[in-house]
């Protein structure tokens, strides 16, 4: 059903992909993740997602295998 079906790089994925691939993350939370990333820069760890309102430890735990955090090398 989902177009991506694999770990989601939360530093590059759009809100549609994030909401489709991460359990417990709807479009509202997915948009908040993208906005947080635009404002504060890339996430360094999956746990950094907890800085986004509505994302807690449980969301990170149930999606641990589906969250990918890549950082761009400059």
Q: How should these model regions be labeled?
A:
Residues 22, 40, 52:
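Acidic-histidine catalytic/liganding microenvironments
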Residues 36, 52, 66:
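Short acidic/histidine-centered micro-motifs embedded in hydrophobic/aromatic stretches
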Residues 1-21, 27-35, 62, 69-74:
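Long, highly charged, low-complexity intrinsically disordered interaction regions
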Residues 13, 48, 54:
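Residue-level recognition of oxygen-bearing side chains
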Residues 28-29, 39, 44-49:
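Amphipathic, hydrophobic secondary-structure cores in small proteins
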Residues 57-61, 65:
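Short glycine/proline-enriched turn or capping motifs at secondary-structure junctions
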């Amino acid at each position: 059903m989902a177009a991506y079906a694999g770990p989601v790089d939360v530093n590059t994925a759009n809100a549609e992909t994030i909401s489709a691939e991460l359990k417990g993350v709807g479009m509202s939370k997915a948009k908040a993740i993208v906005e947080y990333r635009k404002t504060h820069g890339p996430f360094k760890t999956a746990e950094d997602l907890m800085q986004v309102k509505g994302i807690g430890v449980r969301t990170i735990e149930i999606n641990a295998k589906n969250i990918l955090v890549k950082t761009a090398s400059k």
